[in-house]
Amino acid sequence: DLFKGGVKKYTDEELKAILANDQTPVFVAVAPSANDGNDAEHNADSPATDQVLGYAFCVFQQHLNSNILTDIKTLYIDDLCVDERSRGHHVGSTLYRYVLDFARQSGCHNVTLNVWACNPKAQAFYERMGLTPYYIGMEQVL
């Protein structure tokens, strides 16, 4: 397995720096509060009020004065995650569309991300959202 278990992706210090930086926007999907104007009845399967359902960590990228790359502004999604209990309830698609709208309003040419080849569900999700491959990273394990 490539990933360590039981560890956080960011330290507390890294997270504070990310949240304080305009170049690394973070978006969080939370369960609606009881007084959000929705008359739908709360049931045991509904998430608790203000519970985090998902998040997207993003980074603005721009390759200025590159010999080979055009000077386009990109919003790179470093991490998009939805709580396992909230998957299948359109949290990811709503969050992704919000990020897409933010990127458009910020003057970005495109939105990019990386997805692990060992995660076909994520690949299928991103394809449903309209993303297409533009770079393929390869490796040979020694």
Model-predicted segments: where are they?
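Conserved active-site alpha-helix within GNAT-family acetyltransferase domains
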Residues: 93, 105, 117-135
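Conserved beta-strand in the GNAT
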Residues: 28, 50-60, 76, 81
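Conserved acetyl-CoA-binding loop-helix of GNAT-fold acetyltransferases
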Residues: 82, 88-101, 128
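A short helix-loop-beta-strand connector motif used in the catalytic cores of GNAT acetyltransferases and
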Residues: 16-28, 76
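Conserved beta-strand-loop-alpha-helix junction that forms the acyl-donor binding cleft
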Residues: 112-122, 139-142
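Conserved GNAT acetyl-CoA-binding A-motif
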Residues: 104-114
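Conserved GNAT-fold acetyl-CoA-binding loop/helix
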Residues: 1-17
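Conserved acetyl-CoA binding element of GNAT-fold acetyltransferases
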Residues: 70-84, 139
